[in-house]
Amino acid sequence: MELKLLNEQGQPASTLDASDVLFAREYNEALVHQVVTAYLANARSGNRAQKGRSEIAKSTRKPFRQKGTGNARAGMASSPLWRGGGKIFPNSPDENFSQKVNRKMYRAGVAAILSQLAREDRLAVVDNFSVEAPKTRLLAEKLKGMGLDSVLVITDGLDENLFLSSRNLHKVLVLDVHETDPVSLVRFPKVLVTKGALAKMEEAWQ
């Protein structure tokens, strides 16, 4: 599979031969959906909580006698049927949302996303991508000069200047190649990969 190699101005300078295993895989929408959904589910912290009838701070005294009042019978004010009562099936803070995805499926899903990005001309390779200092303005000007607005940049190792420069740009995300995830790949309309990062990706998928 041939990928575009861009220059500093964002113009195609040449092409680069890339691994077919990583960039020529058929797109499997069901697999990609499963991988992305599982990744998002595994990131959930499970911090929501509700109270059941046994946890409500109300008296357990019977509100009124069983018969003769004309009301429906009631045992206690914390009943889920009453206003202010407990919830019948409360959410628990230790609820487990994790979904299991086999390593082979995960790798196939990521490869399918990368292949689709390459086919849609949304993925390109750059020799090097860096800024001289940790300044948001420098990175914003660099991306504007390349005609890029919303972009995911995948680098070979963490470039501190580049990472710090990107933090105030809400449509820009800089990731080390080892931190690349399927959600980030599908979220951005454009993906830039450095040559060093591409080599590490191909090595990992051999």
UniProtKB/Swiss-Prot annotation:
Keywords: Ribonucleoprotein, Ribosomal protein, RNA-binding, rRNA-binding
Region of interest (Disordered), ranges: 47-94
A molecular function GO annotation: rRNA binding
Keyword Ribosomal protein in record: yes
Gene Ontology terms: biological process: translation
Entries under Pfam families matching the protein: Ribosomal_L4
GO cellular component, one term: ribosome
The keyword Ribonucleoprotein is annotated on this UniProt entry: yes
Subunit structure: Part of the 50S ribosomal subunit.
UniProt similarity note: Belongs to the universal ribosomal protein uL4 family.
Reported function: One of the primary rRNA binding proteins, this protein initially binds near the 5'-end of the 23S rRNA. It is important during the early stages of 50S assembly. It makes multiple contacts with different domains of the 23S rRNA in the assembled 50S subunit and ribosome.
Protein name: Large ribosomal subunit protein uL4
UniProt gene name: rplD
